[in-house]
Amino acid sequence: PFWKCFCYRQTWSFIVGKFFTDGVWWFYLFWAPAYFSDQYGYESSSGMGIALIITLYAIVTVLSIFGGYLPRLFVDKKGMNPYAGRMLAMLIFAFLPLPALFAQGAGAISVWWPAIIIGLAGAGHQAWSANLFSTIGDMFPKGAIATITGIGGMAGGVGSFLINKGAGALFTHSENLGAAFRFMGFEGK
């Protein structure tokens, strides 16, 4: 019963969660090489450009895997029920992308700082997203999990398209005006 899935508010919370957050990951994935090239002059084909991207995604990979372990730690060590443990972990992960606001300023110290900070932000996002997927199993019977996952994946794809299309349009508009892009006191091309 595909259409019956839409009768549950849990389905809609998953759809909204994927729609608004998947684009963040694709933004990091798509724009990180251009960021290192435009801001620091390291093309993605250069040794340093490759090292920065590998560092960023190594941090994302290792820490996002830990993100799957944290809720279990809350359940096993703190005695929380699985859903509460997952929600607490997701709250913690939701704060990890915030330091990305300082990545541009930290780049004045070393180009490695933005790679590390953006890596931490990406790891927080991916850990949050992995736990969001796990909530489906907490809320729905086995027969509905694939359907809900597919619906959320589609919503995430549409949200990602809109976020990245909008980001590209803003960057192009700013460049056409000859203006620097400014955000919270930080300035870039």
What does each model-identified segment do?
Residues F2-Y8, S45, P82, A106-A108, ...:
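Helix-boundary and loop/linker segments of multi-pass membrane transporters
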Residues C7-G68, A121-F133, G137, S160-N164:
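Extracytoplasmic gate region of multi-pass secondary transporters
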Residues V16, F20, T55-A58, I92-L96, ...:
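Hydrophobic residues within alpha-helical transmembrane segments
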Residues F36-S37, L70-P71, V75, G166-E175:
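Interfacial helix-cap and linker-helix signal at transmembrane-aqueous boundaries
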Residues G41-I59, A84-L88, W112-I116, T147-I151, ...:
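Loop-to-transmembrane helix entry
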Residues P82-L88, G168-G188:
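A membrane-interface helix-boundary motif in multi-pass transporters
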Residues Y83-L132:
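C-terminal transmembrane helical hairpin of 12-TM major facilitator-type secondary transporters
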Residues G137-S174:
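A late C-terminal transmembrane helix in Major Facilitator Superfamily
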